């Protein structure tokens, strides 16, 4: 503002000068951060942002074994005939975390088609296998509703206890460590094959044949610093952790020993993982096996 263009009274002049000199009137560029955004705030983002691995659809009649089931807390492909998910996809950032206690309220999923058998809270009883979470309880502690959603039996797979409670849990804990260090994650987990070994020995099914025991449990984790426009920020240098674990009580407890490539998981499952990422970057990322820290 050029003051000499106007005749101002002394009071108005003093007020104008004070405003011009005030720090509130100064425009200061925000300090850059690792994400490119100042004061990047964690948000709850699209659970299926990196793509639909199996092309699942909400058509229960024609695709009962690749049924798309979307919830606020996660998205999955569910298999009616196997009584478990093919895969579950979710976003994890500090925005999903809070102080809600573990609810332990295992329950049948009433949102599955009414004509389908719904696996119940006691369906795994006496089987020798844990009710193994795909999307873990501790990833959804922002509210009782969020945590309770992880205890729906549609989110479970029959998992050997050593795998569920130690090896698989170790990676789950490490994922939350990454979040506490300023990252956000996109996670896809699932299982495939038939036949695992629990505390009662080898089995191919439980619950009178209505739930398939998988031979392998797998997970893919894409790690990004907190920011926005997440898919466009994925580069050939983005850290991607992929693991493939045998579903057996004889499994080792160090999750890092079971790291593999995304390509290897795709070959085993037939899925197209990270399909929303550009094909060039996808090819580069999926051929690598992570060798980063594990704790």
Question: Where in the sequence are the language-model features?
Answer:
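Domain-level detector for secreted/extracellular nuclease and nuclease-toxin modules, and
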Residues: 3-7, 21-295
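Alpha-helical hydrophobic membrane-insertion segments
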Residues: 9-12
């Amino acid at each position: 503002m050029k003051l000499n263009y106007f005749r101002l009274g002394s009071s108005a002049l003093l007020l104008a000068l004070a405003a011009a000199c005030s720090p509130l009137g100064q425009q200061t560029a925000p300090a850059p951060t690792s994400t490119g955004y100042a004061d990047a705030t964690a948000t709850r983002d699209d659970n299926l942002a990196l793509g639909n691995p199996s092309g699942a659809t909400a058509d229960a009649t024609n695709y009962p074994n690749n049924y798309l089931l979307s919830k606020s807390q996660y998205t999955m492909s569910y298999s009616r005939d196997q009584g478990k998910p093919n895969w579950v996809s979710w976003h994890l950032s500090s925005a999903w975390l809070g102080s809600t206690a573990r609810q332990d309220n295992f329950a049948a999923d009433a949102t599955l088609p009414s004509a389908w058998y719904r696996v119940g809270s006691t369906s795994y009883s006496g089987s020798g296998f844990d009710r193994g979470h795909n999307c873990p309880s501790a990833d959804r502690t922002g509210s009782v509703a969020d945590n309770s959603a992880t205890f729906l039996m549609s989110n479970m797979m029959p998992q050997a206890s050593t795998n569920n409670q130690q090896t698989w849990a170790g990676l789950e804990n490490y994922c939350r460590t990454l979040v506490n260090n300023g990252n956000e994650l996109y996670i896809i987990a699932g299982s495939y094959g038939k036949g695992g070994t629990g505390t009662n020995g080898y089995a191919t099914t439980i619950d009178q044949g209505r739930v398939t025991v998988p031979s392998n449990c797998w997970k893919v984790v894409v790690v990004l610093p907190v920011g926005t426009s997440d898919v466009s920020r994925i580069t050939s240098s983005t850290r991607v952790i992929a693991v493939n674990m045998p579903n057996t009580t004889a499994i080792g407890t160090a999750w890092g020993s079971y790291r593999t490539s995304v390509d290897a998981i795709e070959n085993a499952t037939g899925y197209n993982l990270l399909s929303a990422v550009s094909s060039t970057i996808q090819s580069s990322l999926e051929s690598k096996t992570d060798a980063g820290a594990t704790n």
